[in-house]
């Protein structure tokens, strides 16, 4: 009798949970339609892989790219709709979240064609690679719209788990295994630190998990200036710092960049920063509204350390990927300036604008590195000497992307940094802006050093890798070159589209 009662209660409880989930999906599912497209794409990939042979490989790329493009289209159609909170407060859709989701989808869309030839040459498993990329993209999109502490913790873990698997995808490479181990251990430690900070925030607010309700809870409990909030701020800053990889939370970055497959590095170098920046902006701006002076100070220290250490250490690197790793640490210092400036002086708009340009500059650079690596098998900066004599198109493309990363006019990086530094100057962050200007000059030095090597014509400086370089045709159907051309154009012709981009970024502010 007791067993029958327990069984009936279990069935009733299960039915209630199922009906509630069905109700949420039915009424709130339209608000995550772009994410649903990616989920449908993932299911299709699994079905095709389990029922087909090697001849259907092009279909896998087609489905992945199509699902990403359709997801971008769905986001664009939803633009300017009223902000909505769905799934019992777990998820929020507004223009601010959607523009970061757009940036993540754009990164993934450009990274897939960048990976095609690399996967074929290295004979890596294709389906799993695409599954991990799409799942990581999905996690990043949910993180951008996360509205409570649980979702903010679970979504980046979805992204991180796929990142660990992607970084160790070349299992036979010792460097890849070492990078994955460091990435996994430090990622696990940072996640535990982050959730510990969330526990302090949860307790101080009286048991609230939604971001806006946490603010109301802190007011009701009069805990908004308590030591517990300061402890929460420190732990959460450290936890988010791992995702953003500013100094001194950058130790994993150079090793992971060097040991991971180059297309994976290209993907992680932009998507992780975009998703973490969106999350950091909302966390600092909403729950820590009453502690703005404290988190401003913390982020200023991180920005200064990142800009100085990242750019100075990049000078000494001999590997292109390690150089770009330290360069990305310096770049995140510039992005943090936009987070500190905030909404009042177009700080968020300048951050979004700079991130859009950073995506094109960084992915364009990595596309050149992937192409050069496949044709020569080397990543050493010294081995790029004389590339212009063998492949002028690739050398010029790499030079333009590097100059744009350095911020030389009239390239995209110059306009992005100009807008970002101008907003910082208007907000009174004079010291930060001066540090940013000085470190930008330092970055131009090591970028120009590489460009000088590219353009050299001295036979004694040209390495055997370039002497034996296989010249590519002027017009090629190579998917890597397609991504490279798109990124180079976006990095070099910003003047026509600068004002509309700024207007869209300003319109996205919450």
UniProtKB/Swiss-Prot annotation:
Source organism: Solanum tuberosum
The reaction(s) this protein catalyses: a plastoquinone + NADH + (n+1) H(+)(in) = a plastoquinol + NAD(+) + n H(+)(out); a plastoquinone + NADPH + (n+1) H(+)(in) = a plastoquinol + NADP(+) + n H(+)(out)
GO molecular function, a single term: quinone binding
Family in the record: Belongs to the complex I subunit 2 family.
Primary role: NDH shuttles electrons from NAD(P)H:plastoquinone, via FMN and iron-sulfur (Fe-S) centers, to quinones in the photosynthetic chain and possibly in a chloroplast respiratory chain. The immediate electron acceptor for the enzyme in this species is believed to be plastoquinone. Couples the redox reaction to proton translocation, and thus conserves the redox energy in a proton gradient.
Keyword Nucleus in annotation: no
PANTHER family per UniProt: NADH DEHYDROGENASE (PTHR22773)
First-tier enzyme category under EC: translocase
GO cellular component, one term: chloroplast thylakoid membrane
Assembly mode: NDH is composed of at least 16 different subunits, 5 of which are encoded in the nucleus.
Highest rank taxon of the organism: Eukaryota
Signal peptide as annotated in the record: none
Pfam families registered for this protein in UniProt: Ndh2_N (PF19530), Proton_antipo_M (PF00361)
The enzyme's E.C. designation: 7.1.1.-
Protein name: NAD(P)H-quinone oxidoreductase subunit 2 A, chloroplastic
Encoding gene per record: ndhB1
GO biological process: ATP synthesis coupled electron transport; photosynthesis, light reaction
Membrane topology, as annotated: Multi-pass membrane protein
Compartments (UniProt record): Plastid, Chloroplast thylakoid membrane
InterPro entries: NADH-Q_OxRdtase_suN/2, ND/Mrp_TM, Ndh2_N
Keywords (A to Z) from UniProt: Chloroplast, Membrane, NAD, NADP, Plastid, Plastoquinone, Quinone, Thylakoid, Translocase, Transmembrane, Transmembrane helix, Transport
HAMAP family assigned: NDH1_NuoN_1 (MF_00445)
Main location: plastid
Residue ranges of the TM segments: 24-44, 57-77, 99-119, 124-144, 149-169, 183-203, 227-247, 295-315, 323-343, 354-374, 395-415, 418-438, 484-504
